[in-house]
Amino acid sequence: MLLPLACLHGRVAQCLTSLLVLAEPFPRPRRGAKARGAAPTSAEPAPAVAKMAAELYPPASPSAATATDIANSNAAGAAESTKVGLCCPPCLAPAPLPPLPAPPLPDNNNPESPNWQSFHPTLRERNALMFNNELMADVHFIVGALGAARRVPAHKYVLAVGSSVFYAMFYGDLAEVKSEIHIPDVEPAAFLVLLKYMYSDEIDLEADTVLATLYAAKKYIVPALAKACVNFLETSLEAKNACVLLSQSRLFEEPELTQRCWEVIDAQAEMALRSEGFCEIDRQTLEIIVTREALNTKEAVVFEAVLNWAEAECKRQGLPVTPHNKRHVLGRALYLVRIPTMTLEEFANGAAQSDILTLEETHNIFLWYTAAKKPLLDFPLTKRKGLAPQRCHRFQSSAYRSNQWRYRGRCDSIQFAVDRRVFIAGLGLYGSSSGKAEYSVKIELKRLGMVLAQNLTKFVSDGSSNTFPVWFEHPVQVEQDTFYTASAVLDGSELSYFGQEGMTEVQCGKVAFQFQCSSDSTNGTGVQGGQIPELIFYA
C-alpha cells in the first residue's frame, strides 16, 4: 500500500533526525535476512548509542527532569497519535530522543564562572564585583590591631587611581614590594568602607564606625568620603555626643564640624556637660570647653562636670579616685572653672564640700563672698556671657477687642519649620489686655505627634501688648526642613491681646521660619492671627 506523500516526508525527516542523534548506524541485517523476510528494527538504540547519549546528556536537576518528562510524554503522545492516524509501519517509527539538558542559570555573583562579565554591563558594576574579592587580587592588607586583624584582598590599580597615598605606595619611587601590607591603626570595618567607595563609589556609613572611617579617609586622602563622614556626623549631632565629636573634629581638623559642635554645646550646655561623652574627651578639649565664654549654663554645672571627668580620667590611668588624684589629672583645668561666679548657696552646698579644693582655697572663696576686703583668688571672677536668645515674631501687629481674645483652657497651636538647625528655648505669649493678670500655662513642642519638651508653669502679664516669655526646661534641638508643632494651653479669665496680619515666612537673622496652621489648635490660633506670637530660640 502506498503511503501519502505528507506522511512519507514526515517519516523521512524523523528518521534522518534519529540518524543524526545516534552515534552509530543501525546494525546491518545478517546475510539471508531478506530471504527470510526479516527487517531491521529501530525501536531500541544499540547499547553503545545509549551509553554515548548518557555521556552527552547527563541527568538534569529534579525540577528540570520533571519538565523534561512532561515534554517527552507530550512528544510520545503526539507520536502515538501520528502512528495511529497515519498507520505508519513499525519500521519507520523513530527512536526515542534523549532528554534535552536544562539551560544553566546565570550566576551573577560568581566572577569565577565563565563569561561573568556579561552579567555586569557597566564599568562600575564590574569594578564593584572586584571589591573584597580574591580574583586577580595582587595585594593583601592585614588590617586591625594584633588579635583582631583581618586579611583583605585588593587590586593595586584600583587603589592607586582612587588615592594618592596608595599611588605612592604601589607606583612611587619608594613603592611597596611586599605582597602583604600591615595596617594596625585602621579598623577592619572602616577599611572595608574605604575600599568599597574606591571600587564602586558607594558610601555605606554607620554610627559605630563613622569616626574610624573618617580617620581612614583622612589617612589615605580620599576627600569625598571624608566629606560624607562629616555630613553624617553633623546629621547625627546632638547634646549627648557633641563633646566627643568636638574632640574628634579638632583631631581631624574639620572646622565646619567643630562649629556645628559648638552650636550644640553652647545652646544645650547643661545636657552636653552631663552626658557620658563629656567624660571621654581629652584634657585639652576639656580645657577649651571650660574656658568657653558662650556656655549657656550655671557654673555649678560646669564644676560638677569637671569632677566627673576627673573621676573617669583617674580610672583610665589606673589611679585611685581620691581628691589628690583628681587635682593631679585636672591640672590647670581646675583653675579655669569660674567658682566665684556661683551663688554663695551653690558654692557652700557644692564646691566647698567636694574636698577637691584646699582648705585655704575654700576659706578665701568664702571671704570673697562675704568680706569687704576680698582676697586674691586663682579662679576667674567674671561670669560667662552665655548666649543671647533670639525671637521670631510672626505677626505684624497686635490688637484687643471687647469680646475677644480669651484664654479658656483650650489649645492654641501653630506649626513651623526652619531652614537650618536651631534650638527652641521657649515661647512668647500675649497676656491680659485689661491690666495685670496671672496665667497658668502649659507649653509643648512636638514633632510628628511625639512630645519633645513641655513645661507647666505660670507667668504674670502687666496689661501691655508686649509678649511674655515662657521657657522650656532645656532648649530643644530642631532640625531643618521638618515641621514642628508649638502649643500653649492657658487658663485665665481675662481678655487678652491677639496677633493679626500673620506671615507665613519670617527671616530672623540667618534663620528662615515657615508657618502653617495646626490641627491641634482649638482656640482659633492660625497663621493669620491668634496667640503664640513668638518663638524664642538660639542659633
Swiss-Prot record:
What organism, scientifically named, is this protein from?
Mus musculus
> Which PANTHER family does this entry report, sorted A to Z?
BTB/POZ DOMAIN-CONTAINING, BTB_POZ DOMAIN-CONTAINING PROTEIN 6
Q: What does this protein do?
A: Adapter protein for the cul3 E3 ubiquitin-protein ligase complex. Involved in late neuronal development and muscle formation.
Q: Name the gene behind this protein.
A: Btbd6
Q: Please name the taxonomic classification of the source.
A: Eukaryota, Metazoa, Chordata, Craniata, Vertebrata
List the transmembrane segments.
none
Subcellular location, in the record's words? Cytoplasm
By its UniProt entry, which InterPro entries does this protein fall under? BACK, BTB/POZ_dom, BTB_POZ_BTBD6, PHR, PHR_sf, SKP1/BTB/POZ_sf
Q: Using the record's annotation, list all stretches that form the BTB domain.
A: 137-207
Keywords in alphabetical order = Cytoplasm, Signal
* Signal sequence, start to end: 1-23
Name it. BTB/POZ domain-containing protein 6
Q: Look up the domain of life of the source.
A: Eukaryota
Cellular component GO terms, alphabetical: cytoplasm
